[in-house]
């Protein structure tokens, strides 16, 4: 399999049902080696569900998904995942290094001891995430930003071709946010494909190569510079043309009938406003 295949993502006509309700429909999305793609949308829009579907944790009702050249869950050696921070048990008495090593479990195998390559991968991941000096510290002693970097290091320990990040900027201070932004851009420049969900619209517009507006389906998918039509943002977030959000993302101005970027051809999605 080529490097370009390992860094690729292809989602075609995806639909997902959860609890008997359709939460995603007609999702079409692609990413290539070295892309940095941001998924933006309101709470409940399906952003995390898209990531979980790519991981094989959610089964599609319809459509196809290929990540790192394989079906979801099949290419796990090449996929790293950073969940939302609250999903980790931070009160568990374990060191930073041990958490990062846990990211190598599938590579090591169950009930087997880590080898030299595993220790090298963990050391490199800790250094990349700026956590090498805290390797022996218990995770319960860490700040919010440090905890986020531990989860990123754990994902990097797999040496992924594709890195999926769920709300990586939530609850971190400005220096950590700047450090993470620099890290993500560097990883992308080195050929890692990154897909992140975030509510930090300013950060996403300043950092991502492409922005995908999501509300149960793909509303628009383009570069930040091209997503200046307020109509796309109004439809995604259910806001009026006078909303301050439009100024925040640089989309304030007359509402035009044409849509910037690549608009979804599916029927207009209902606006999700809660998780």
Question: What feature does the model see in each segment?
Answer:
Residues 55:
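Helix-to-loop junction immediately C-terminal to a conserved catalytic motif
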Residues 225, 229-275:
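ABC ATPase nucleotide-binding domains
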Residues 63-75:
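Conserved ABC transporter NBD signature motif
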Residues 163-167:
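Catalytic Walker B motif of ABC-type/P-loop ATPase nucleotide-binding domains
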Residues 138-142, 146:
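Conserved ABC ATPase signature
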Residues 216-221, 225-226:
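Conserved switch/coupling elements of ABC/ABC-like ATPase nucleotide-binding domains
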Residues 116-134:
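Conserved ABC ATPase "signature" region
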